[in-house]
Amino acid sequence: MKGTPSFGKRNKKNHIRCRRCGRNAYNPTKKYCASCGFGRSKRLRRYSWQNKKPVTGKRLK
């Protein structure tokens, strides 16, 4: 089921506040932060697709 009654069962916290980045993205069961990667790696989790790239080489009419 996926309707309104099923949403009443969603009441437990999957993420808590992260020690490193402070965002509410640390998963205590998997023991890693979905935002900064704390618990998985020593380096900060960041990807090139997170930021929009400036438009270059586009022809203007």
Curated annotation (Swiss-Prot):
Keywords: Metal-binding, Ribonucleoprotein, Ribosomal protein, RNA-binding, rRNA-binding, Zinc, Zinc-finger. Binds 1 zinc ion per subunit. InterPro entries: Ribosomal_eL37, Ribosomal_eL37/eL43, Ribosomal_eL37_CS, Ribosomal_zn-bd. This is Large ribosomal subunit protein eL37. A zinc finger (C4-type) spans 18-36. One of its GO terms (biological process) is translation. GO terms for molecular function: rRNA binding; structural constituent of ribosome; zinc ion binding. Pfam families: Ribosomal_L37e (PF01907). Zn(2+) binds at residues 18, 21, 33, 36. Binds to the 23S rRNA. SUPFAM superfamilies: Zn-binding ribosomal proteins. Belongs to the eukaryotic ribosomal protein eL37 family. Its cofactor is Zn(2+). GO terms for cellular component: cytosolic large ribosomal subunit.
